[in-house]
Amino acid sequence: MALHFTISEYQQRIKAAIASMQSNNLDGLLMFQQESMYYLTGYDTFGFCFFQCLYLGVDGKLALLTRMADLRQAQHTSVIEDIRIWTDQAGAQPATQLRDMLESLGTRGKRLGIETNSYGLTHFNGKAVDAALDGFCRLTESTNLVNLLRLIKSPAELKYVRKAGALGEEALKAGIRKTKAGADEGDILAAQHAAIFSGGGDYAGNEFIIGSGRDALLGRYKSGRRKLSRRDQLTIELAGVYRHYHVAFMRTIIIGKPSALHIRMDEVCRAALSEVESALQPGKTAGEVFDAHARVMDAHGMQKHRFNACGYSLGAKFTPSWMDFPMLYRGNEVELSAGMVFFTHMILMDSDLGAAFCLGRTYIIGDKMPKPVSRYPLTMIVR
């Protein structure tokens, strides 16, 4: 069995989930987020692109409904013993088979939480679940029940976070070494991924971002590579990943002599990151962290060029995105606590002048000040 934590740790997590269910007057929880399944049981798959659901009752019963293709995946990677299979065939109705499973578990008439805000539950399947369970049980929105438990990492999880950080730093260094005038973006990407995989890491929850020239202003991956010019800018965002735990890095690398605008952007980004770092303390809210970022950016006349969020939590995430709950944006009242992990990104994109500058770092929140997972220097990288 390929478990990455002790049975005791999984039991503690399940116990905490049950306690949260009880405090919310729930008799059970229907999970569609792969992250919840992995956190509570170790179940590791990308099969959530199809219908699957993990049930946890307040009595501790666990049962998974999935496809035959994931039967052995669940057997090999999780503590789940009760695995039910819905049948691939014309006219298949997995939501009805979910109801049958719940009937066998004694949940008729019960109040069940359900994770509706999930890549693992499409609108189509969500409507089918609503129809199948209408009159059978009472459903209540519970997407964040396990999310809130996942926010604070255990010592064992933080060990994986630090390993992911070490892999990410090696990937950053490998990419920098490949960066020079005439270099192909594809070679830079290849070096980054090679560093992670050769170090025992995993695929990331989303593609790495890479873009040069005007495409250095893009905050997402896109298809198509180019070669770097003698004077250029290259924006990269990558994550070291270990046991699905992510530690992200973001930098804009300058090729050739930095422009006066790049120098100014660099100064503003570092000043903003310093303020954000000071705000990453227990008792502060996610919204207050964003406010610290915005104050610095706006005071330097960069409001037009900054983003409306400056980071997000990181943890064990699956495709299509490594961004976790919660995000750092204005008014977000989620309170920070020691043991949380946040990626903070200072992003400036000046479309008028075609200039970009980004500086991103991942922190573990401590009892007072946060600790950067990687201490790679924050000074401008010039190649």
Short names for language-model regions:
Residues 1-383:
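Active-site neighborhoods and metal-handling regions in enzymes and metal-associated proteins
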